[in-house]
Every structure is written in structure tokens, then in C-alpha cells.
């Protein structure tokens, strides 16, 4: 069908069946998701010892740059937020404010036991029991602190999740 001239009857039939729109829409989705997944720009929100492992992941041994992952300091330039460490009640408002400043589409990676569910400080009165109560989380990376390999695997899972989404 590619390269052929369609008659009006064929065009109306394909248009009614949604063939052209569906195929073109899925191609656009594929290209957009491929570009988004290959150029993730995370912003670090390091609150505790997990941030050290996040820096370790960005170093030359694991080299996130080869996956298209480059850290940004400003939330306006980032599309991924990595929350690493214990989130307190006072810090929750700042986390939400930074999340709201990020450009769409935005993704959140919760790194470590403290960010996932409060961790060791779960029963403290001043600790939020998981950053998913403040912002929507896409990927959870377990561990206390999680290894650099675990964060790298989490980022690769996020890339695969982005590739599977449908935009149109």
C-alpha cells in the first residue's frame, strides 16, 4: 500500500477503519518514546546516604551518559526526579514544589528504603512514610542504601516504561 495512489473509495474505507490514523499514530508514538527514553535528564533530590550511591552511579564506572542520562541541577531542565533518602514533613512541601516546576512529561524514581516507605525512621513523627504520598512515583529502587547497579537497573526500567507508553 505504501507508494500507491489511493482512490476515493479506498481512502474512505481506510479512513473509516482507522487504518491510516492508527498506523501513523503508533509510528509517532514509537519515535517520540524512543527519543524520550534515550535522553533522560534526572534532577537529584538527595536527602541522605542514598545520594552518595546516586553520585557513584553517575561516576565513570557506570557512566550513565552512555545511556543518555545526564544530571541537571535545575528542575526546569529535568524530566526525571530521583528522590534519595528520608523525606521529612518539612521537606515534603519543597519536594512537591520542585516536582511542579519540572517540565512535562515528568517521572519520579524513589531510591532507597527511606524514600520508598520511611525506612529506618518509619515510626518517627516527622517522617513521611514514602514519597509516593507527595508525588506520583514511577519506579521504586529497593535497598538501604541501594547499590549503584540497582539504581542503574531502575533507570533502565524507566526507559523501558517510557518506550511502552502511548502518547496519542
From Swiss-Prot:
HAMAP family: NDH1_NuoB
Reactions catalysed: a quinone + NADH + 5 H(+)(in) = a quinol + NAD(+) + 4 H(+)(out)
Leader sequence residues: none
GO (cellular component) term, any one: plasma membrane
GO terms under biological process: aerobic respiration; electron transport coupled proton transport
Organism of derivation: Wolbachia sp. subsp. Brugia malayi (strain TRS)
Cofactor: binding comment: Binds 1 [4Fe-4S] cluster.
Record's protein name: NADH-quinone oxidoreductase subunit B
GO terms, molecular function: 4 iron, 4 sulfur cluster binding; iron ion binding; NADH dehydrogenase (ubiquinone) activity; NADH:ubiquinone reductase (non-electrogenic) activity; quinone binding
Keyword annotations from UniProtKB, A to Z: 4Fe-4S, Cell membrane, Iron, Iron-sulfur, Membrane, Metal-binding, NAD, Quinone, Translocase, Transport, Ubiquinone
Family: Belongs to the complex I 20 kDa subunit family.
EC number: 7.1.1.-
